[in-house]
């Protein structure tokens, strides 16, 4: 009876949101929380004893201790020949056959005989930001065990921060490389939409999906990008030669309401210490950024429904994942097409901004990483909170590249936060050059 009641509550919540139309978007985080709360089954972080140590990996192939090859981890929504692509899901791990071929994004790594050390853990179907996984277990944030690792590329970030890999390939649809990088103190790059092939990658939202590298530092992230795009090392060298110091780089500082003042101060301190030419961007851009954030969330959530709606009531799919799918059904029917219609205007806005500055700077997250919830009812609240505090999805909505790089933070529960740098299309080399300068300055 409890399960029937839970389903009826979910249905009534969805129905009310549909009736409210686009204005109902303001209530979506509340609905997401309530859908999880009413799911009718346990959704506490799981533990699968088959996984090694910190649960960073779903499949792990220990490297030769004497090898000097670059170690590469691959998120488990990217096909590796002969290995089941689980996308972080119990149902896929039980029903899917091993991939028949590698995803094309692995071609360069294979040619260079990079040592692939495993398939990394992730949030199921890559559709939530906490980094939690009910079946394979939640990867343990090595910097503070009681904090979320961030997602959906949680295993990548934990493996990097734990020293288990040098580079990781992940996907970023709404922040999935940058958010875990921000939570675990590593580097994450979201690449320009369409730059890296996404064939052989389990989809979330084809308008937003990207593949990109994560690294334990900027140098390794550059190496990761060079494994994804032939000739990138030369582009990066050219970017360093063109702008060897921060004084020649104009950075537009974007400030958003609701950001922890300590985090804003940490971002300002990092920019000042690096020596960029900092230009304050006006509030009108902040308003447009917030609208793009809402639109990007709408499109990303709808993508979860489009890609995974068939699993809404399937056994072997986590309740929290089902709630995101239901959330996506709401956004698909109430705002998906109108959000996509506003995309070109947001892209034009950013192009205009990049006529005046080289890069845009803001925090990756408006708050410090939250703790892992201990009660079911807190999980929905956590996911809704993360929708509000991540500054990532507006970038995916535009298709531009962005870099998350750790910087020091004072007076908080963690000693770091994450600076997000946004660039024009195809500016990955410029972003990593700027990240190099930041990393060097804050570590002096």
Regions found by a protein language model. Give the residues of each.
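Gly/Ser-rich, acidic/histidine-flanked active-site/gating loops
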Residues: 72, 78, 84, 107-111, ...
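Serine-dependent amide/ester hydrolase catalytic core
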Residues: 307-397
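Short, well-ordered alpha-helical
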Residues: 40-103, 125-128, 369
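Short helix-loop capping/hinge segments that flank enzyme active sites or metal/cofactor-binding pockets
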Residues: 69-92, 295-347, 404-415
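Short pre-catalytic strand/loop immediately N-terminal to key active-site residues, enriched for Gly-Thr
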Residues: 92-99, 137-151, 381-382
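N-terminal secretory signal peptides that target proteins for export/translocation
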Residues: 1-23
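Bacterial N-terminal signal peptides
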Residues: 29-39
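Structural helix-boundary/capping segments
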Residues: 42-44, 111, 115, 162, ...
């Amino acid at each position: 009876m409890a399960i029937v009641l839970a389903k009826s509550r979910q249905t009534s919540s969805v129905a009310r949101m549909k009736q409210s139309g686009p204005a109902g978007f303001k209530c979506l985080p509340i609905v997401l929380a309530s859908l999880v709360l009413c799911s009718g089954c346990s959704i506490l972080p799981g533990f699968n004893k088959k996984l090694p140590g910190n649960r960073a990996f779903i499949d792990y192939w220990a490297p030769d201790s004497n090898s000097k090859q670059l170690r590469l981890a691959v998120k488990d929504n990217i096909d590796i020949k002969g290995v089941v692509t689980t996308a972080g899901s119990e149902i896929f791990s039980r029903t899917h056959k091993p991939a028949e071929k590698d995803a094309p994004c692995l071609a360069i790594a294979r040619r260079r005989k990079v040592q692939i050390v495993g398939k990394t853990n992730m949030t199921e179907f890559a559709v939530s930001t906490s980094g939690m996984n009910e079946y394979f277990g939640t990867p343990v944030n090595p910097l503070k065990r009681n904090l979320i690792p961030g997602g959906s590329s949680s295993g990548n970030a934990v493996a990097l921060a734990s020293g288990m890999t040098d580079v990781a390939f992940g996907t970023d649809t709404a922040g999935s490389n940058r958010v875990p990088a921000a939570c675990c103190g590593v580097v994450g790059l979201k690449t320009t939409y369409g730059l890296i092939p996404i064939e052989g990658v389990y989809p979330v939202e084809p308008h937003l999906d990207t593949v990109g590298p994560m690294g334990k530092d900027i140098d390794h992230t550059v190496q990761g990008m060079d494994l994804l795009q032939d000739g990138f090392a030369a582009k990066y060298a050219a970017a360093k030669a063109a702008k060897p110091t921060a004084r020649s780089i104009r950075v537009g500082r974007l400030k958003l309401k609701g950001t922890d003042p300590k985090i804003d101060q940490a971002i300002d301190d990092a920019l000042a210490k690096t020596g960029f030419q900092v230009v304050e961007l006006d509030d009108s851009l902040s308003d447009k950024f917030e609208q793009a954030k809402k639109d990007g969330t709408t499109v990303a959530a709808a993508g979860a429904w489009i890609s995974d709606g068939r699993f809404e009531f399937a056994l072997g799919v986590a309740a929290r994942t089902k709630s995101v799918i239901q959330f996506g059904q709401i956004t698909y029917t109430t705002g998906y097409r109108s959000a996509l219609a506003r995309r070109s205007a947001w892209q034009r806005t950013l192009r205009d901004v990049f006529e005046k500055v080289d890069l845009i700077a803001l925090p990756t997250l408006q708050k410090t990483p939250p703790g892992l919830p201990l009660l079911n009812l807190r999980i929905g609240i956590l996911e809704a909170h993360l929708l509000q505090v991540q500054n990532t999805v507006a970038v995916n909505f535009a298709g531009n590249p962005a870099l998350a790089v750790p910087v020091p933070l004072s007076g908080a529960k963690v000693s770091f936060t994450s600076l997000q740098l946004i660039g024009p299309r195809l500016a990955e080399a410029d972003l990593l050059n700027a990240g190099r300068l930041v990393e060097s300055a804050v570590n002096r």
